[in-house]
Every structure is written in C-alpha cells, then in structure tokens.
C-alpha cells in the first residue's frame, strides 16, 4: 500500500508490520484479526490516512459503506452470529477504519463490547471455525454481489 507523504510515520494502519489481508482494492482493504475469542473479527481499513468518513468524497463514502455492508454479509454467511458489531472509533489510531465483529450470546463479553469487561471465562469461542481461504472467498463474492447491485 502506497501512502501519501502526509501519513504519520508511526501510523500502524499506514505502515502495518503484518496483516492477514482477505481483500483489497485501490481505496481500502479488509483484514482478519487474530483473536481467539472472536475468530471472525475483521477490520476494513481505508488506505489513505484520513480520520473521518466525512473526509472522504461522497463517492468514496458510498464505496466504503458498500464494502462494509458486503463484509457484514460475508461474516453472517460464514459465522451465523447472533449479532454483528460494527464500530469506528479512531480514538487510539486516528486513521479511518471499521471493526466488524461477529458476536454470540455466549461469547466472552456479550452483551458488553469486546473491549469491555469479560462477562464469562474465556475458552473455546462459540463461533464456527472458518479458514482464511473460505472467508476471503465469501468476502470477495459478497463484495462483487453488493457492488453489482
């Protein structure tokens, strides 16, 4: 990913050390987060170093939202969660990105946010095991269908 020269040298999303990229285009990428409690946890990262959705043009906003919705569809298809959490904070890393997290009624933190206090002991996640290749294919297919119409 080529970042503009205005990107801060310490931005971990502009200059990632290692990412498990499931899909990408010139504007953004979808990565899978390695979290044993939340194996379907993905992140949608805008490639350009901007902080807010409103920093994007209307066309870029639509593209970002279309990708976000397509990834949600893929996560629902692959993981059959009770809920999908979508979050965009940027308080710690002020680079536009979205968290997409399949949630289950009996996951470690439910009904609290995954960053909140655990509600039960960790252990095996209630999520089905889905390998990277299957999830990447589901993401690509959902994006193609969502963008097509």
Where are these regions (language model features)?
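HIT superfamily nucleotide-processing domains
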Residues: 2-149
